Amino acid sequence: MIYFQCDYAEGCHPKILAKLTETNFMQTPGYSEDAICDAARAAVRKVCGTPDADVHFLVGGTQANTTVISHILRPWQGALCADTGHIAVHETGAIEATGHKVLTMPNSNGTISAQQIHDYCTNHWNDGAHEHIVQPGMVYISFPTESGTLYTKQQLTEIYTACKQWDLPLFIDGARLGYGLMSPACDLTIEELASLCDVFYIGGTKCGALFGEAVVITDDKLKKDFRYSIKRHGGMLAKGRLLGVQFLTLMEDGLYFDICKQAVDYALEIRKAFEAKGVEMYGTSMTNQQFPILSEAQMKHFDGKFAYEYWGRYDDSHHIVRFCTSWATKQENMDALLKAIKEM
């Protein structure tokens, strides 16, 4: 079986594994208070062009989302996001479990707009009973979205402007950040993205690390006591240097971006191959996730040979599935899949 099911099926990039082995018997303080984590934080700041940012290392995406969101919000507030947002549909109520409601808005190809933020906040504050309603306290988006789509620089600028107008911190979930930034459809640099939000994270788990996400806080108002929030949510890894080693390696010599670009290039080959066979694609993803709309017979053509993700029913006779590439996708596996698509 060849896996195109997700972007976390393999372990980690060989350079990371080598560094973990090299530093295995090094003795360091715990809880990310070691020299390696200090160097990794400095490397992240340099890459992001954020010399004054606070950088924290957490283990996984849901943990990062829950920690950041609950740290930002007051008890009576909720997080605005798309109705397809990860915190709304794929985190098993993790945000709600902290006492905060996820306030969803209709998505457009996975994204939300500045106008939706304006409308939601206007409606809330114009309601005479607004004190009886969960107050919007922040905005959550992901880059790329759950649909593999991207916000343009203009869209993100407009969203951040709206957030500033309504005094809402903007949090960008970057679980697949590298794949988004390396898409040919992306008109943003990581420096620009960092300047257009209050907090974001650089995903490692899906982008070459064994595990780990690097939370970057640029808004001074959100920095205070964040490590308390990490500990409270079970995210303070005793052997924190394992996270530092990984992110220091990913940030060196552009490794993070190089391995993500290869995954995107492969994914676009998959998209092109399906389109050449007349297969309709669901959405306009130009990142490492591709969503062909297949008949049951076409799905069976791949079953037993390729693992893919079932995404949902499209109509009475067609289904949306996801083929996902990663930093570790091999050329021979790509060749096999492209051949299978051609023979479909």
At which residue positions do the language-model features occur?
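General beta-strand structural signal in soluble alpha/beta enzymes
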Residues: Y3-C6, V55-V59, C81-A82, I141, ...
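Conserved N-terminal alpha-helix of the aminotransferase class I/II PLP-enzyme fold
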Residues: H13-G61, D83-A88, A94
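Conserved PLP-anchoring active-site segment centered on the Schiff-base-forming lysine
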Residues: H71-V89, H118
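Conserved C-terminal alpha-helix-loop-beta "cap" of PLP-dependent enzymes
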Residues: R74-W76, L268-K342
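PLP-dependent aminotransferase-class I/II
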Residues: G99-G137, I141-P144, Y151-E158
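Active-site C-terminal subdomain of aminotransferase-like
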Residues: Q135-P136, S142-T145, L150, D187-T287
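Catalytic PLP-binding core of fold-type I/II PLP enzymes
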Residues: Y151-S183
